């Protein structure tokens, strides 16, 4: 078969491996295509060759081409179309080519989901599904899941004697909610749907916990953990061997060698036990005993070597101690008891998952909708049937597709999942050695495990297939990179040859996997790859992890901004392939890659400050945009106007336009009740002249609101939104603001979002608001509407995932010091495709919980998979660069980190030890140790080659490795220049001037005093009562010193106290009655008592307060001259709240600060009446007078007048400021004795 392949044409640009990938056939073929290797061109050429094959031409619709994205599918069709048109130019009479062009549009070149959809549309009658089904929106799907799950759990809670369910609830929920249980059910449902047979996977999960009659050696978890035990013991042995080598050096502590040899023997015993069984290791661990180190005279040996030896030995002991504590502190049989105890609970959990899946599928079926996992499973259901042995086999439909497709070509095969693999398997030939499946991908770029992609499928075939394809499938390596300069490729290879291996990384980065130079570039300047490690100084480290992250982002952003600006300003040159010449770099040539986007806004801000145009698709901030936020609040108010915060936001917005004072005035009309109730009440009455403008604004909005609420009940949501835009004029208004086009685009997106929502199974405004809340809860904010095109001359910021498949002349990879995200490993329960379910053992009755064997195994497995995934993410980032690669990371303590990274220099193998690679917590933990073994790090380290082999130390790659002081980045530019001059002078041993032009500035700063020191000892906001007390205290009437000298009043014990209201509570009750008494009705005992009873019913008074009201004293007031004036007044206002600014010297008699300072004063005026000749202010008092003053009221009057003079003066000032009318009279009314005092200034 191989001999029949066409030979590569003379002068062809295809490499031998590329040509092999184009023409090889007759078996399943796996093409491992490295980054930039031209895999898409190879794929297109292969398809064209099959179509135009003279002996056996294939129609394009007999090929199934599966791509990862719709954009890739369209690009593939375009490329094939262009290639066919070129062929047609050479063969204008070819009917076959013309036919292919006509077939191209309906050819099966699509994503796997589009192919599934095509199958389902064709064979829907084999399923219980409406042929008019639609694809569900993700948020809609989530809301449906909530509904189904709530119903199921409600039913379960209602079942009597549901013992196992309540056991499940007790173990996995908190006292407040069952959110954790809901998360478990949903997670198990999602994970199960990634398998061809979800129910079977769930059943296996339960079976794993049925350990009746088994030993610990029978458990898959124990087998895996034993491998990990061997790994950790091997790490411990490496530490001891290294310590032994150091101890045997000329200056080494030789007496330590004997003990170290004993340590090695002990570790050897443990390793032998680990190769036998779990029980053997357990028994060996119980007998671990470390010898005591012999005392030595440290001055006789090199102190650093002694420290290293002791440190390495302690690391080895810690490895063993960790194993003892985590795995071997319990007897093996106790682990088995955990599984047996958890088995019925897990069985119940899985039953709930199955019920949920069944109900969820039924609900989607009823609503005529499917999700993307349904597409895969429905397609698989059509293509498969169950054989007699219970396994899945191809159905008649699958056999039809097998006959139809001459070849199935899968792009990005490394990102395929188990279900997709099964679908592909059923439409291709059974035998790999005679197969028709062509797969292209790069497992080193498999970075979608979080989407349940399974790189193991690619790896399995890569290990199984051979280069010759004898007896099975064939693998072809496309290692030549046609994208990048030598410096980028060699730099990437140098790092990955040291960090990526099968044990840690899942694939060997061997000679076949290495990137090989395929591109030609002219000589360039400053093209070496760079590692810039920023030292975050103590002054820069902010308390808290979040603060430190903010600071790191700022430092890296500043450094990148400086470098980009410098490269652009200096005319740094990059190669332009179109003109085949070098040209000055432009902003569009730069990209900043981040693992995730939280730093992006800060980086954007910094670049903008430096005048650098920048673009990032943040996919956040849309709902935070002011115009969107205001509109969302309008819709919340339309849905439910009783919500105070949204309503206040709308009233304060430009739509209604109330200012702070008007909002406060409205609230003053009703302390109780919602804003909406107060507004409704306010609009029912006739407004005061000064409130007419406020009344008009509110009346306009109130009428609109009622119309919108009625409209919302009858019409579509999208129509309502456009109606609100039109009737408020808000859409036109935002168009006139700065960035008006952007704002209007955001409002149009909201309208479009509503239309999309209405295309779902949900309806109505309330549901829409819940729909949006769900989006925000999931963190799926949409990002503001795009106002900048991607082709603009701007620096781009994007995630590494988004950059996959793209290339840029200059690449910054930032945030390399950020810790890997290990949150998934910290969850209360863990799920794994192979190991199933793992959680802590929880006994709610004994109130104990501890780690189980399954949890330990799954956590370890997931950690190793996470490490492998992060390696692949880093590989994708580094291979985006065409000409210049700059890596940036920030550390808190560079010296401490360097000391850790320098351990790598002690090893002579290319691949760094597993424990160094597996122990990495960030990308720098891989990059820095790798580069510290290269000669170019000598500019930083000055340590020489040491024991590093020549092939590593002198590897053909160019690097600049630098530690950057964070202070120089945060300092202003002039300071940096001055510092540089001083450093240069110091290096050349020149005198440094002691004087500086900044001397005066430094002196002023050191001697500076805060100009408002007095203000720091006084409150900026005071109540009238507090100011009154302040005056009394200053005058000595409330002197704290005198209080101390008074004999303490002995209070009665509580059980002897007479129950009743306090003086303050009585006073509050009287004021409440005076506020609410109806002045239009006769003031009689019966009427007052009826009104007081009504106040109790409305909860304005308590029953106890009502009992204490002296009705006759209230009547006495209204019988008095002052009370009659109240009844006869033009207008009466009661309990009027106010705030005003007051000069600080008026509020504080001890004020020594600057004049002109103000404080905020707030208070409540009991009563004000407007008469023909002016305004009178009345303050009601419930002070005790009768019997307290020997001289009666005449003695009390001057004292009481002095006590309340300041208070009434402030009330009067507040009224005069707000009403612009003088207060003619200020009166105190005392209920005790029916006394009136007119207070004069």
Curated annotation (Swiss-Prot):
HAMAP family: AddA. Its cofactor is Mg(2+). It catalyses: Couples ATP hydrolysis with the unwinding of duplex DNA by translocating in the 3'-5' direction; ATP + H2O = ADP + phosphate + H(+). Residues 12-485 form the UvrD-like helicase ATP-binding domain. Keywords: ATP-binding, DNA damage, DNA repair, DNA-binding, Exonuclease, Helicase, Hydrolase, Isomerase, Nuclease, Nucleotide-binding. Heterodimer of AddA and AddB/RexB. This is ATP-dependent helicase/nuclease subunit A. GO terms for molecular function: 3'-5' DNA helicase activity; 3'-5' exonuclease activity; ATP binding; ATP hydrolysis activity; double-stranded DNA binding. The gene is addA. One of its GO terms (biological process) is double-strand break repair via homologous recombination. Residues 505-805 form the UvrD-like helicase C-terminal domain. It comes from Bacillus thuringiensis subsp. konkukian (strain 97-27). Its EC number is 3.1.-.-, 5.6.2.4.
């Amino acid at each position: 078969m191989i001999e029949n392949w066409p030979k590569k044409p003379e002068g062809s640009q295809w490499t031998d491996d590329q040509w092999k990938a184009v023409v090889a056939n007759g078996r399943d073929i796996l093409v491992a295509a490295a980054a930039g290797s031209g895999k898409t061109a190879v794929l297109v050429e292969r398809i064209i060759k099959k179509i135009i094959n003279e002996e056996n031409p294939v129609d394009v619709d007999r090929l199934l081409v599966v791509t990862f994205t719709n954009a890739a599918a369209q690009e593939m069709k375009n490329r094939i179309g262009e290639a066919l048109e070129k062929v047609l130019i050479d063969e204008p009479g070819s009917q076959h080519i013309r036919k292919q062009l006509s077939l191209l549009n309906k050819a099966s070149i699509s994503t796997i989901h589009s192919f599934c959809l095509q199958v389902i549309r064709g064979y829907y009658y084999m399923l219980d599904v409406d042929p008019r089904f639609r694809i569900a929106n993700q948020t809609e799907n989530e809301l449906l899941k909530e509904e189904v799950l709530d119903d199921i759990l409600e039913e379960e809670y209602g079942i009597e004697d549901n013992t196992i369910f309540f056991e499940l609830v007790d173990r996995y929920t908190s006292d407040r909610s069952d959110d954790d249980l809901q998360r478990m059910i949903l997670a198990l449902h999602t994970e199960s749907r990634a398998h061809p047979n979800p129910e079977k996977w769930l059943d296996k999960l339960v079976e794993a916990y049925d350990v009746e009659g088994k030993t610990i050696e029978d458990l898959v978890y124990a087998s895996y953990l034993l491998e990990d035990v061997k790994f950790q013991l091997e790490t411990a042995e490496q530490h001891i061997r290294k310590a032994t080598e150091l101890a045997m050096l000329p200056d080494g502590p030789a007496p330590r060698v004997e003990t170290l040899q004993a340590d090695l023997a002990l570790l050897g015993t443990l390793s032998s036990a680990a190769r036998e069984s779990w029980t053997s290791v357990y028994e060996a661990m119980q007998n671990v005993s470390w010898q005591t180190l012999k005392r030595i005279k440290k001055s006789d040996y090199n102190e650093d070597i002694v420290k290293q030896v002791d440190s390495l030995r302690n690391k080895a002991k810690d490895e063993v101690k960790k194993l003892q504590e985590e795995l071997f502190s319990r007897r093996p049989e106790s682990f088995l008891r955990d599984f047996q105890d958890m088995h019925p609970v897990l069985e119940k959990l899985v039953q709930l998952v199955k019920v949920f899946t069944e109900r969820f599928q039924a609900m989607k079926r009823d609503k005529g909708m499917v999700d993307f996992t349904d597409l895969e499973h429905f397609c698989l259901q059509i293509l498969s049937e169950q054989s007699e042995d219970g396994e899945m086999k191809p159905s008649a439909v699958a056999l039809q597709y097998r006959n139809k497709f001459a070849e199935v070509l899968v792009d990005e095969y490394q990102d395929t999942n188990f279900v997709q693999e099964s679908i592909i398997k059923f439409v291709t030939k059974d035998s790999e050695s005679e197969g028709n499946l062509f797969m292209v991908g790069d497992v080193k770029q498999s970075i979608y495990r979080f989407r349940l992609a399974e790189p193991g499928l690619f790896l399995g075939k890569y290990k199984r297939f051979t280069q010759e394809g004898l007896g099975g499938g064939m693998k072809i390596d496309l290692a030549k990179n046609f994208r990048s300069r030598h410096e980028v490729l060699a730099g990437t290879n140098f790092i990955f040859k040291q960090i990526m291996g099968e044990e840690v990384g899942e694939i060997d980065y061997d000679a076949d996997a290495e990137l090989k130079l395929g591109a030609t570039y002219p000589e360039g300047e400053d093209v070496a790859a760079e590692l810039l490690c920023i030292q975050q100084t103590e002054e820069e480290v902010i308390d808290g992890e979040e603060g430190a992250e903010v600071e790191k982002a700022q430092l890296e952003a500043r450094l990148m901004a400086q470098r980009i600006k410098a490269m652009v300003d200096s005319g740094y040159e990059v190669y332009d392939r179109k003109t085949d010449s070098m040209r000055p770099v432009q902003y569009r040539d730069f990209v900043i890659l981040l693992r995730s986007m939280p730093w992006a806004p800060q980086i954007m801000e910094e670049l903008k400050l430096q005048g650098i145009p920048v673009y990032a698709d943040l996919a956040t901030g849309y709902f935070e945009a002011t115009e969107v936020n205001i509109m969302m609040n309008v819709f919340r108010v339309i849905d439910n106007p009783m919500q105070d915060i949204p309503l206040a936001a709308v009233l304060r917005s430009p739509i209604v336009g109330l200012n702070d004072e008007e909002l406060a005035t409205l609230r003053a009309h009703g302390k109780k009740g919602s804003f909406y109730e107060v507004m409704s009440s306010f609009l029912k009455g006739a407004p005061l002249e000064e409130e007419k403008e406020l009344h008009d604004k509110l009346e306009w909005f109130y009428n609109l609101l009622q119309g919108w609420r009625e409209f919302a009940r009858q019409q579509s949501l999208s129509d309502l939104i456009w109606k609100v835009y039109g009737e408020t004029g808000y859409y036109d208004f935002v168009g006139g603001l700065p960035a008006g086009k952007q704002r209007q685009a955001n409002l149009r997106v909201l309208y479009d979002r509503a239309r999309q929502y209405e295309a779902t199974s949900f309806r109505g405004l309330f549901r829409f608001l819940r729909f949006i809340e769900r989006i925000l809860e999931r963190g799926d904010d949409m990002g503001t509407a795009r106002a900048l095109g991607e082709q603009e001359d701007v620096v781009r910021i994007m995630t590494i995932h988004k950059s996959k498949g793209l290339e840029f002349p200059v690449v910054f990879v930032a945030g390399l010091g950020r810790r890997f995200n290990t949150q998934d490993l910290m969850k209360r329960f863990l799920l794994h495709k192979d190991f199933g379910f793992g959680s802590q053992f929880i006994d709610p009755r004994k109130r104990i919980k501890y780690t189980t064997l399954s949890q330990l195994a799954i956590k370890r497995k997931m950690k190793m998979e996470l490490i492998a995934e992060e390696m692949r993410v880093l590989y994708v980032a580094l291979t985006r660069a065409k000409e210049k690669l700059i890596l940036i990371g920030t550390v808190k303590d560079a010296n401490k980190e360097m000391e850790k990274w320098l351990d790598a220099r002690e090893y002579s193998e290319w691949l760094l030890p597993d424990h160094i690679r597996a122990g990495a917590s960030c990308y720098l933990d891989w990059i820095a140790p790798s580069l510290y073994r290269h000669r170019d790090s000598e500019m930083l380290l000055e340590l020489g080659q040491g024991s590093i082999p020549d092939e590593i130390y002198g590897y053909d790659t160019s690097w600049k490795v630098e530690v950057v002081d964070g202070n120089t980045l945060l300092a202003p530019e002039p300071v940096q220049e001055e510092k540089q001059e001083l450093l240069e002078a110091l290096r050349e041993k020149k005198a440094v001037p002691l004087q500086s032009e900044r001397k005066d500035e430094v002196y002023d700063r050191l001697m500076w005093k805060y100009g408002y020191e007095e203000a720091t000892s006084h409150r900026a906001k005071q109540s009238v009562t507090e100011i009154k007390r302040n005056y009394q205290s200053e005058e000595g009437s409330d002197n704290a010193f005198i209080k101390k000298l008074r004999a303490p009043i002995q209070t009665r014990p509580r059980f002897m106290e007479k129950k009743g209201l306090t003086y303050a509570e009585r006073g509050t009750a009287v004021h409440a009655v005076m506020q609410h008494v109806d002045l239009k009705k006769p003031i009689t005992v019966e009427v007052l008592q009826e009104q007081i009873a009504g106040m109790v019913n409305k909860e304005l008074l308590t029953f106890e307060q009502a009992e204490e009201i002296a009705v006759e004293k209230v009547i006495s007031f209204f019988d008095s001259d002052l009370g009659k004036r109240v009844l006869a007044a033009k207008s009466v206002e009661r309990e009027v709240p106010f705030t005003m600014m007051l000069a600080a010297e008026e509020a504080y008699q001890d004020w020594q600060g600057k004049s002109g300072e103000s404080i905020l004063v707030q208070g409540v005026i009991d009563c004000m009446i407007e008469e023909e000749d002016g305004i009178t202010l009345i303050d009601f008092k419930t002070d005790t007078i009768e019997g307290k003053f020997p001289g009666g009221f005449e003695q009390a009057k001057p004292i009481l007048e002095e006590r309340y003079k300041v208070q009434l003066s402030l009330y009067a000032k507040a009224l005069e400021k707000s009403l612009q009318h003088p207060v003619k009279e200020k009166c105190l009314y005392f209920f005790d004795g029916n006394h009136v005092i007119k207070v004069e200034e």
